[in-house]
Design a protein with these regions (language model features):
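Ribonuclease/tRNase effector modules and their secretory precursors
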Residues: 1-111
Length: 111
């Protein structure tokens, strides 16, 4: 089950470097779009079921300001200055994923 992001989620920012910037932008998703999806109230987040043991990873699905449905994989990182979100990969969603997202958002709004 995917859960909506709550506005109470606090983090100090994003962690970007050459390693994740290129991988995230490889599918044409801009950094600003990724950051918006990870902070938007209608983004749904779930633990990554395919992640091997180790660093926790999460899947986020949501919409950019322009309305593009976007899929983001990220990990939270604890730093001295506070928690940061490190995007790992991002791409625009396929039609089937969009339908699933819309169903989950409707279900969350009914609660």
């Amino acid at each position: 089950m995917l859960e909506p992001v709550t506005r109470k989620t606090a983090f100090a920012g994003f962690e970007w470097d050459a390693g994740n910037r290129g991988k995230c932008q490889k599918h044409g998703v801009a950094i600003q779009e990724i950051e918006h999806v990870l902070t938007h109230a209608e983004t749904l987040i779930t633990p990554d079921p395919k992640n091997p043991a180790g660093e926790p990873r999460f899947l986020a699905i949501g919409r950019t300001r322009q309305g593009r449905y976007t899929f983001v994989v990220f990990t939270p990182r604890q730093r001295a200055a506070g928690a940061r979100l490190r995007p790992i990969s991002a791409r625009y969603m396929h039609k089937r994923e969009i339908r699933k997202y819309e169903q989950e958002i409707a279900r969350a709004q009914e609660r």
